[in-house]
């Protein structure tokens, strides 16, 4: 159906005392992203014209963390209830738009559920998101007459009879801007909490003869709020379970779905295999037939077809062409690039370095600020000495070079095509094509030499 223009209000002023943290509650992360950012993303995906963020505690930290240009920051200096929070945002409401109210500590609300709520809102009425609970203790109850919603009674204000009601308010609702402003102006704090409840607008709307339509979410987890770290950890597992299920159904082989974490987005080809305790962060692309071993962390990287990443490898902001092999215990830092068939072995670290086709760095090596050609062998213990204490310099190695073990390349330096660097060499000057570079001190031998003995 055709919807009116819509703005979203996100309530995020709470301190989160039960988190026992200096960080505002809504900035605690779920799947690597602040809870409130999940809600902001949902609002933007819905096409919100404006997103009004009502904040209080930790405002400076919130503003540092949230860079969304679409946010309108609304201060709630005193936390006097949800109705009071909405009153702070009301001056920004247009009369002819719908206002959707969300919460920064309810991170798993889905765009699909919110769109259904938006579609269900009657003309001049209210769309209300509700759920039924076996144990509704502590929640506001939905009151009805002849099946029609008439109001919401908070638990502390409810009668014994009303406390038997299982349908509860989630706090998420949508109404017209002009109506919302009028109802907000009529709120009082005449209740057990001495606060201004947004829920009172339901009774006000009913008294005006307006229709209130209740909609249920697809999953209960969508409307679960977070007040402590235990609740946050439970929602984290719910989210991760849902992501793992989607990947499995899409053809990704997760060896143990309960031991996989997705903290971003994963684009994948066919026949991808992911072992246990793997973490995917940011935007990651895995080609066809990629295999990732246990304990790996992959962040903001592209992994080509037929690559194999062995256990306990960290790959960040890197780009791997087809048929590369990495690890175990390797680290590819930002700017690492491997061309087809390249190999990086155990305890090798790369940063701003490029390995050519078929090039191998087998073990115990640091390659930083380097451009390395095709079919190069990098011996164990090789180090590109790229930093002089003030500036970084580049090492260039041509095709078909053999670099012996325990070599230090003091940048800036260039090694020509086909050259050989003898083991134990410190390269301080350019090496020509097909040349042998060696800088070892001549070996001497002292016959009958005795090691020092400790004095007793």
UniProtKB/Swiss-Prot annotation:
Gene encoding the protein: glmU
Catalytic residues (positions): 363
Residue segments, region Pyrophosphorylase: 1-229
One cellular-component annotation, GO: cytoplasm
Similarity comment text for this entry: In the N-terminal section; belongs to the N-acetylglucosamine-1-phosphate uridyltransferase family.
Classification via InterPro entries: Bifunctional_GlmU, GlmU-like, GlmU_C_LbH, Hexapep, Hexapep_transf_CS, MobA-like_NTP_Trfase, Nucleotide-diphossugar_trans, Trimer_LpxA-like_sf
Binding site for acetyl-CoA: 380, 386-387, 405, 423, 440
Pathway assigned to this chain's UniProt record: Nucleotide-sugar biosynthesis; UDP-N-acetyl-alpha-D-glucosamine biosynthesis; N-acetyl-alpha-D-glucosamine 1-phosphate from alpha-D-glucosamine 6-phosphate (route II): step 2/2; Nucleotide-sugar biosynthesis; UDP-N-acetyl-alpha-D-glucosamine biosynthesis; UDP-N-acetyl-alpha-D-glucosamine from N-acetyl-alpha-D-glucosamine 1-phosphate: step 1/1; Bacterial outer membrane biogenesis; LPS lipid A biosynthesis
Residue segments, region Linker: 230-250
First-listed, main subcellular location of the protein, grouped into a coarse class: cytoplasm
Superkingdom per UniProt: Bacteria
Binding site for Mg(2+): 105, 227
Required co-factors: Mg(2+)
Details of cofactor binding: Binds 1 Mg(2+) ion per subunit.
Protein name: Bifunctional protein GlmU
Region (N-acetyltransferase): 251-456
Task performed by this protein: Catalyzes the last two sequential reactions in the de novo biosynthetic pathway for UDP-N-acetylglucosamine (UDP-GlcNAc). The C-terminal domain catalyzes the transfer of acetyl group from acetyl coenzyme A to glucosamine-1-phosphate (GlcN-1-P) to produce N-acetylglucosamine-1-phosphate (GlcNAc-1-P), which is converted into UDP-GlcNAc by the transfer of uridine 5-monophosphate (from uridine 5-triphosphate), a reaction catalyzed by the N-terminal domain.
A molecular function (GO) term: magnesium ion binding
């Amino acid at each position: 159906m055709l919807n009116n223009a819509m703005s979203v209000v996100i309530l995020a002023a709470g301190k989160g005392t039960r988190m026992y943290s200096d960080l505002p509650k809504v900035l605690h992360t779920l799947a690597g992203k602040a809870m409130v950012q999940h809600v902001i993303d949902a609002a933007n995906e819905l096409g919100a014209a404006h997103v009004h963020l009502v904040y209080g505690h930790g405002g400076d930290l919130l503003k540092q963390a949230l860079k969304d240009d679409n946010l309108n920051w609304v201060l709630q200096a005193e936390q006097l209830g949800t109705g009071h929070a909405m009153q702070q945002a009301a001056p920004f409401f247009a009369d002819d738009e719908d206002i959707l109210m969300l919460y920064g500590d309810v991170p798993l609300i889905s765009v699909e559920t919110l769109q259904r709520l938006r579609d269900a809102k009657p003309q001049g009425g209210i769309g209300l998101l509700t759920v039924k609970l076996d144990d509704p203790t502590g929640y506001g109850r939905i009151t009805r007459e002849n099946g029609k919603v008439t109001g919401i009674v908070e638990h502390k204000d409810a009668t014994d009879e009303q406390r038997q009601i299982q349908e509860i308010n989630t706090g998420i609702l949508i109404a017209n801007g002009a109506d919302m402003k009028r109802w907000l102006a009529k709120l009082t704090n005449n209740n057990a909490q001495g606060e201004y409840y947004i829920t009172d607008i339901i009774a006000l709307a009913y008294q005006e003869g307006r229709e209130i339509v209740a909609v249920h979410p697809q999953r209960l987890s969508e409307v679960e709020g977070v007040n402590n770290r235990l609740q946050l950890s439970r929602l984290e597992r719910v989210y991760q379970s849902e992501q793992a299920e989607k990947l499995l159904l899409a053809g990704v082989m997760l060896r143990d779905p309960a031991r996989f974490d997705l903290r971003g987005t994963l684009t994948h080809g066919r026949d991808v295999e992911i072992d246990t305790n793997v973490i995917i962060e940011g935007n990651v692309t895995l080609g066809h037939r990629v295999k990732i071993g246990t304990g790996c962390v992959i962040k903001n990287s592209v992994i080509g077809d037929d690559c194999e990443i062995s256990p306990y490898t960290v790959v960040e902001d890197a780009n791997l062409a087809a048929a590369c092999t990495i690890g175990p215990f390797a680290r590819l830092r930002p700017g690492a690039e491997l061309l087809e068939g390249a190999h990086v072995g155990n305890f090798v670290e790369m940063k701003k370095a490029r390995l050519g086709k078929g090039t191998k760095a087998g073990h115990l090596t640091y390659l930083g600020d380097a451009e390395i050609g095709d079919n190069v062998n990098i011996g164990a213990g090789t180090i590109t000495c790229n930093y002089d204490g003030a500036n970084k310099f580049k090492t260039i190695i041509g095709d078909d070079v053999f670099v012996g073990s325990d070599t230090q390349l003091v940048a800036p330096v260039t090694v020509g095509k086909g050259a050989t660097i003898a083991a134990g060499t410190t390269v301080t000057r350019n090496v020509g094509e097909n040349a042998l570079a060696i800088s070892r001190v001549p070996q001497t031998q002292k016959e009958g030499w005795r090691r020092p003995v400790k004095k007793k």
